[in-house]
Amino acid sequence: MSAPISQALWDARIPLLITHPLAPTTPFITSIPRFSYLALLLPRLSAFFNTPCSSFHFEDVVLRNLPVGLLVDLYQPSLPWRLIVNDGVSWDISDTFLNAAKEADFIRNGNANQIMKLSKDDTRQLWHAVIDNDLAAFSRINNRLLNAPTALKHVPMRIYLPLAPGGSAGGDVGEPTVDQQQGGGDASAAGAFKIIQSLVQPLGADRRPRLLGQVLRETMPKLFPSSRDPVMANVLLHGVAVPFNAPLADLMREAAYFDGWLSFVVVVL
């Protein structure tokens, strides 16, 4: 990662105002890095509200264990982000992170050898760097994952497509999808979205770097009829629109989330 870009991403924070149904007038006010998980707040919230807390709700949506910045890009809340915490479905957040990082490693290399070769202590340090929002400690381990001895095979890239009520995304976009949806698999549920994923090579047949706009047009041609400019939709990454002429391999190194994924959110214009 370029130091100024990566430091800016790790420094960015989201202000939160969190309440519990048992104490609606006593909010827990804090901020959290965009490069973090809401679930890391649960021990503090359980102590603050003096009751078990394991799930977060925004309006009528039960939030998944995605990076905070990705959730903000998906739901576009006003700030401070007003959340409700309660007892409900919970996940082991360290497993969530490690599984996502393994998937990204497999996509990059065709195997997960790089991350599987990490020692137990290295894996622990990688996770604790996320917990501590420690870019320097994270980079010491993550650079070994990004600099494999073999050439990059594919770019770990997912496109999150918010769905309107009824499961529509503004028409049939004809995209390959991963079988994951917010809302318990119910595409008509509040806050539902599709995750679109395909194998994206870093170089084209002409050996030139693949650009974001090219891949968007190939993947979702009805939403992205132009590979040069946003016409019907744009994509957000870390809260900002991404230039369509950005090389994907460079984006991966400069702006992937801590789990190794480029996670774009579609915004229909």
Swiss-Prot record:
GO MF term set: Atg8-family ligase activity
Gene source species: Beauveria bassiana (strain ARSEF 2860) (White muscardine disease fungus)
Gene induction: Expression is reduced when the vacuolar protein VLP4 is absent.
Consequences of knocking out this gene: Blocks autophagy and displays increased sensitivity to nutrient limitation, with decreased conidial germination, growth and sporulation. Leads only to a modest decrease in virulence.
Crosslinked residue numbers (Glycyl lysine isopeptide (Lys-Gly) (interchain with G-Cter in ATG12)): K102
Name recorded for this polypeptide: Autophagy-related protein 5
GO biological process, one term: cellular response to nitrogen starvation
Description of post-translational modifications: Conjugated to ATG12; which is essential for autophagy. Conjugation with ATG12 involves ATG7 as an E1-like activating enzyme and ATG10 as an E2-like conjugating enzyme.
Family: Belongs to the ATG5 family.
Keywords for the protein's UniProt record, in alphabetical order: Autophagy, Isopeptide bond, Membrane, Protein transport, Transport, Ubl conjugation
Topology with respect to the bilayer: Peripheral membrane protein
Record InterPro entries: Atg5, ATG5_HBR, Atg5_HR, ATG5_UblA, Atg5_UblA_dom_sf, ATG5_UblB
GO cellular component: Atg12-Atg5-Atg16 complex; autophagosome; mitochondria-associated endoplasmic reticulum membrane contact site; phagophore; phagophore assembly site membrane
Locations listed in the record: Preautophagosomal structure membrane
Pfam families documented for this protein: ATG5_HBR, ATG5_UblA, ATG5_UblB
Keyword Cytoplasm belongs to the record: no
Originating gene: ATG5
Subunit field text: Conjugated with ATG12. The ATG5-ATG12 conjugate forms a complex with several units of ATG16. The ATG12-ATG5 conjugate also associates with ATG3.
Stated role: Involved in cytoplasm to vacuole transport (Cvt) and autophagic vesicle formation. Autophagy is essential for maintenance of amino acid levels and protein synthesis under nitrogen starvation. Required for selective autophagic degradation of the nucleus (nucleophagy). Also required for mitophagy, which eliminates defective or superfluous mitochondria in order to fulfill cellular energy requirements and prevent excess ROS production.
